[in-house]
Swiss-Prot record:
<keyword id="KW-1043">Host membrane</keyword>
<protein>
    <recommendedName>
        <fullName>Putative membrane protein 165</fullName>
    </recommendedName>
</protein>
<feature type="topological domain" description="Intravirion">
    <location>
        <begin position="1"/>
        <end position="7"/>
    </location>
</feature>
<dbReference type="GO" id="GO:0020002">
    <property type="term" value="C:host cell plasma membrane"/>
</dbReference>
<keyword id="KW-0946">Virion</keyword>
<keyword id="KW-1133">Transmembrane helix</keyword>
<keyword id="KW-0244">Early protein</keyword>
<keyword id="KW-1032">Host cell membrane</keyword>
<keyword id="KW-0812">Transmembrane</keyword>
<feature type="transmembrane region" description="Helical">
    <location>
        <begin position="8"/>
        <end position="24"/>
    </location>
</feature>
<dbReference type="GO" id="GO:0016020">
    <property type="term" value="C:membrane"/>
</dbReference>
<comment type="similarity">
    <text>Belongs to the asfivirus envelope protein p22 family.</text>
</comment>
<feature type="topological domain" description="Virion surface">
    <location>
        <begin position="25"/>
        <end position="166"/>
    </location>
</feature>
<dbReference type="GO" id="GO:0055036">
    <property type="term" value="C:virion membrane"/>
</dbReference>
<keyword id="KW-0472">Membrane</keyword>
Length: 177
């Protein structure tokens, strides 16, 4: 009697082991669960991002470079390869010593809007005028003689191509609130 019970238990264990063996052959091992990444902090302006070096880009706080942020904000933008850096400002990505090539599609959307004379600060004035226009994605200040004497140009093409030049400053509007 005990022998029959022992054989039954051994057969039961063998059947269970066979089930595990067969299921292991036919059902490949699942990938381990990915580690849960911390949620990205949502933002509307740079002041919402408390971490050092973080800026609000596309509604999330990130430490991506200014040029990468532009490419993220404005899809299909074509930047001149000579442009290697830019700066974040509260409403614009600002380049030093750059302008649009007048022959590019971006340059063809250049609108001559205002000629400035002292005592206005040219760049600040151009920036305010661009922010007042609904279609303005960028502005340029061509300086004449004094720091504040020059001309404002505005751009409305959504995919600008930037070209280097020594006597102008171009800024592209950021997509922040």
């Amino acid at each position: 009697m005990y022998l029959v019970l022992l054989i039954a238990v051994i057969l039961f264990i063998i059947v269970i082991l066979m089930i595990f063996l067969i299921s292991g052959l036919f059902y490949p091992e699942q990938e381990p669960a990915l580690p849960i990444s911390p949620p990205k902090k949502k933002c509307k302006t740079d002041t919402d991002c408390k971490d050092k070096g973080h800026h609000c880009v596309g509604g999330i706080c990130t430490n991506m470079s200014c040029l990468d942020a532009i490419k993220y904000d404005i899809k299909d933008i074509k930047l001149d390869p000579n442009i290697r850096s830019c700066n974040y400002t509260p409403k614009f990505y600002k380049f030093s010593n750059t302008t649009a090539d007048l022959q590019s599609p971006f340059g063809k959307t250049r609108i001559d809007d205002a000629e400035l004379y002292d005592p206005h600060s040219g760049e600040d004035f151009c920036q305010r005028l661009c922010l007042d226009r609904k279609d303005c994605i960028g502005w340029e200040f061509d300086q004449y003689y004094a720091k504040t004497t020059g001309e404002c140009y505005f751009y409305i093409d959504p995919h600008p191509a930037l070209k280097s030049k020594n006597d102008a400053v171009l800024a592209i509007a950021r997509k922040v609130s």
